[in-house]
C-alpha cells in the first residue's frame, strides 16, 4: 500500500494567556478612557495616565524617567504595561522582565540590569544602497588566459545587458559576480538585481514578456522594473544597543584551532565590559551626529519591583541619569514593607524613598462588582467558553468575595465539567462543583489552621 500522510501547516496555535484580550489602552481621540474598550474595563484614571506616558514616549520626551504602577494583586498593573507596549507598536523597543530575573550565579545583577537597559534602547540605522535592476538582455563572459598556465581559460570579466522601463545599460562586472549569477541560474529574459556595494545578485523571476512562450511552466513571471536601471534605495534597519554589544563582544570567525574549539564549546554567559559599551556609545554618537542613525528610547518594564534589592535601586538611580537611558516602568503590589537587602528599613512599595521620589506613580484601584462581571464576559469570549447569565453572576460573586484571578481560573475547568455533564453551556451547578474541587487561598489557609491541617509538616 502506498503511504500517504497529511502535511500539517507550521502555523502556531496561539495559547490563550492571562492578558490575551488586551489590545490597547482603549482611549478616545481626546485622551479620555472609555468604560470598556480594547479589552480593558474600568481603571479609567490609570489608563488616561498611561496614555499621557505613551504620548511622551512617542515624542521622545520621557527618556531617563520612571513610572511606578502601584496597586493590589489583580488590579491590572501588568495589563496596563502590556497595553502600553501594544499602543507603542513594534518600532519602539519594549523589554519586559521580572524583579527576580536579574539574580544569576554567572553574572552580576547590575550587569543584568544594564543588559536589559540596553535591550530597551533601539537604534534606527539608515543605509543607502546602489542597485542595478532590470531584465537581462545579454550575458557574455569574457575569457582570458589562465595566469597559472595550462590550457584552461579563466573568466576575466562579465558583460551583462540590463533593460528597465526607462532605459538600458551595459555593465562590465567582476568575475566573482559571475559565480553568483551561475548559482541563481540566470538566463537571458530573467529579471535580476545586483547590489553595487556587496556584489550580491538575486534573481527576481522571469520577465512577463516571455509568459506565452510555454503552456506548462513552474516559473514566476514579473513585470520589467520601473524607472532607471541604476537606482539608489534607502534601507532602514532597527537594532538594539544590546545587539551591538553582543556582536562586538563575541567576534565570529578565526581559522586557528582555538577559535574552532571556542565555537564548539558551550557558550558561557559572559559580562560585557564598560569599556566596550563606552566604545559602542562613541560609534553610535558619531552615527547620530552624521545623521546616519537615530536613537529610539524604548521601555524597560520591571514587574514585581519589590524583589529588587537596595544595590539594584542604587544602580538604577545612576543608570536613569545616564545620557542614553530608556523609560523605566516598575510594577509593585506591596504596601509598606522592608526593602530587600536591608535588615529593618521599611519603605512604601518596598522601594527606597530617594528612588521613589524620581517616579511618576500611577495607582490602580480594586474592581467593582459590575466591572468584574464585564471582565468575566470578555474572558469567556476570549477562551471560547459559553456561560449562562446565572453562572456569570455566581463567578462574579467569587471575584468580589475572593479574588479576580480565582474567579477567572474557574472558567475553563467549569467548561470541562459542563461537557462531562452533557451541557454546552456552563451552569451554576458547574461553578459550584468547581468551587468544591479547587480551593482558594483563604479556604486553604483556614484548612491548615484547623484540625485537618495537623497532617502537614510545620
UniProtKB/Swiss-Prot annotation:
Residues bound to ATP: 71-78
Cystine crosslinks: none
Keyword DNA repair appears in the UniProt entry: yes
SMART domains the UniProt entry points to: AAA
The reaction(s) this protein catalyses: ATP + H2O = ADP + phosphate + H(+)
GO biological process, one term: DNA repair
Top-rank lineage group of the source organism: Eukaryota
Keywords assigned: Activator, ATP-binding, Chromatin regulator, DNA damage, DNA repair, Helicase, Hydrolase, Nucleotide-binding, Nucleus, Transcription, Transcription regulation
Subunit structure of this chain's protein: May form heterododecamers with RVB2. Component of the SWR1 chromatin remodeling complex, the INO80 chromatin remodeling complex, and of the R2TP complex.
PANTHER family: RUVB-RELATED REPTIN AND PONTIN
Name the UniProt record assigns to this protein: RuvB-like helicase 1
Amino acid at each position: 500500500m502506498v503511504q500517504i500522510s497529511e502535511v500539517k501547516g507550521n502555523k502556531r496555535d496561539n495559547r490563550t494567556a492571562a492578558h490575551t484580550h488586551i489590545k490597547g489602552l482603549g482611549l478616545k481621540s481626546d485622551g479620555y478612557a472609555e468604560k470598556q474598550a480594547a479589552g480593558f474595563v474600568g481603571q479609567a484614571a490609570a489608563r488616561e495616565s498611561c496614555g499621557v506616558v505613551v504620548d511622551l514616549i512617542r515624542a521622545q520626551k520621557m527618556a531617563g524617567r520612571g513610572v511606578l504602577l502601584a496597586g493590589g494583586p489583580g488590579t491590572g498593573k501588568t495589563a496596563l504595561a502590556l497595553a502600553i507596549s501594544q499602543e507603542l507598536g513594534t518600532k519602539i523597543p519594549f523589554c519586559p522582565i521580572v524583579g527576580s530575573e536579574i539574580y544569576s550565579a554567572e553574572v552580576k545583577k547590575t550587569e543584568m540590569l544594564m543588559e536589559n537597559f540596553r535591550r530597551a534602547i533601539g537604534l534606527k540605522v539608515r543605509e543607502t544602497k546602489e542597485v542595478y535592476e532590470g531584465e537581462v538582455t545579454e550575458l557574455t563572459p569574457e575569457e582570458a588566459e589562465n595566469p597559472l598556465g595550462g590550457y584552461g581559460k579563466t573568466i576575466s570579466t562579465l558583460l551583462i545587458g540590463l533593460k528597465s522601463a526607462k532605459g538600458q545599460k551595459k555593465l562590465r562586472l567582476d568575475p566573482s559576480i559571475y559565480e553568483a549569477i551561475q548559482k541563481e541560474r540566470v538566463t537571458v529574459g530573467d529579471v535580476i538585481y545586483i547590489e553595487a556595494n556587496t556584489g550580491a545578485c538575486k534573481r527576481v523571476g522571469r520577465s512577463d514578456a516571455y509568459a506565452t512562450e510555454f503552456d506548462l511552466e513552474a516559473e514566476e513571471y514579473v513585470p520589467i522594473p520601473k524607472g532607471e536601471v541604476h537606482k539608489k534605495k534607502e534601507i532602514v534597519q532597527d537594532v538594539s544597543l544590546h545587539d551591538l554589544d553582543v556582536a562586538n563582544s563575541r567576534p565570529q570567525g578565526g581559522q586557528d584551532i582555538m577559535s574552532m574549539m571556542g565555537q564548539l564549546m558551550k557558550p558561557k554567559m559572559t559580562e560585557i565590559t564598560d569599556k566596550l559599551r563606552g566604545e559602542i556609545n562613541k560609534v553610535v554618537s558619531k552615527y547620530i551626529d552624521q545623521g546616519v542613525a537615530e536613537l529610539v528610547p524604548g521601555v524597560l518594564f520591571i514587574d514585581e519591583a519589590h524583589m529588587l534589592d537596595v544595590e539594584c535601586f542604587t544602580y538604577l538611580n545612576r543608570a536613569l541619569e545616564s545620557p542614553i537611558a530608556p523609560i523605566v516602568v516598575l510594577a509593585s503590589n506591596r504596601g509598606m514593607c522592608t526593602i530587600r537587602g536591608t535588615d529593618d528599613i521599611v519603605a512604601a512599595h518596598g522601594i527606597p524613598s530617594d528612588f521613589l521620589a524620581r517616579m511618576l506613580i500611577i495607582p490602580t484601584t480594586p474592581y467593582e462588582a459590575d466591572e468584574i462581571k464585564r471582565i468575566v464576559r470578555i474572558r469567556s469570549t476570549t477562551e471560547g467558553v459559553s456561560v449562562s447569565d446565572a453562572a456569570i453572576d455566581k463567578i462574579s460573586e467569587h471575584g468580589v468575595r475572593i479574588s479576580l484571578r480565582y474567579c477567572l481560573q474557574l472558567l475553563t475547568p467549569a467548561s470541562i465539567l459542563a461537557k462531562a455533564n452533557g451541557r454546552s453551556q456552563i451552569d451554576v451547578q458547574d461553578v459550584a462543583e468547581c468551587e468544591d474541587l479547587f480551593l482558594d487561598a483563604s479556604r486553604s489557609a483556614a484548612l491548615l489552621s484547623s484540625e485537618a491541617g495537623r497532617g502537614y509538616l510545620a
